Amino acid sequence: MKNIESTACVILNYNDADTTISLVRKIGDYKNIEHIVVVDNCSADHSLEKLEKISNEKVVVCQSPRNGGYGFGNNIGVQYAKEHYGAKYVLIANPDVEFEESLVSVLQNKMQQDRSIAVVSANQRGVDGQLKKSGWFLPGKAETILHGEVLCAILLDKIGGRKLGATPQSGWKFVDCVAGSLLMVDADVFLAAGGYDPEMFLYCEESTLGRKMMTLEKKTALYVSESYLHNHSVTISKSYNVKGQREQLLKSTLTYLKKYCDASKFEIHMASVLYKFGTLELMVIKEIKRLFRR
């Protein structure tokens, strides 16, 4: 095996400097990550001041010109890593994840061994130790529309999980999409594809990236023999309530349907109705849980 090409890690921060700093300190000594690029997505608090204090020869902190969301901010980070450090591989990490140095090596080696692969990741587990949705096949129009209603979403996720479960439970699986909480990309391919869609603020970026990779005839692979910890949505929850999250989800879903699924006006309308109904369902469920906790 020849030497691994340059690898950088991009961490996007928004109003959560303490979580971001904790991750930077944990991975700061990883020898297989040469540079860490922290992008502050125009936080509304004093995140930037805190983050600048951890800047050193390995860690650079930069600020996006505006809060353009997950995709916009990570695009800036990948571009910076490529232009300033010549990074071949970029590990995109949420601030609320934990992963071992050995996992980074596994991801690097896979990409270097198979140049047809442009995106890799591993299984993600929650703080409860349970396996979370880590990789999936590209959703079609019908699935995307129906996913707005809570019960349909649960059933569709179970069906999708069974499909992935039909393949071996160790080693590598080829999938269409991987979770955006932790993934490694080939920087050249990622940037050639235009990166994440900047019109999507918070959701659907994974499926959009999957479609872009398929268009370029590049593969996405998931390593299921190891996992990383994801304190799911701790950063998102600090910035958006349930209604706010659902509003962002609807906006991104409609963009995905229009730009990548050639959806009709009727299909767009149906998606809007189902997602708004799903929001009402979740708010009712939340209120019922609150009442029972009294």
Pin down the residues of each PLM region.
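Short beta-strand-to-loop acidic/aromatic patch adjacent to the donor-nucleotide binding site
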Residues: 86-98
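Conserved donor NDP-sugar-binding/catalytic core segment of glycosyltransferases
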Residues: 98-134
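Short, flexible, basic/aromatic active-site loop/helix in glycosyltransferases
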Residues: 139-175
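Short, well-formed alpha-helical segments that are part of the catalytic scaffolds
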Residues: 15-29
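A conserved acidic beta->alpha catalytic loop
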Residues: 17, 40-49, 66
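Active-site-adjacent helix/loop segment of glycosyltransferases
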Residues: 208-290
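A short, conserved alpha-helix in the catalytic core of glycosyltransferases
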Residues: 168-170, 176-227
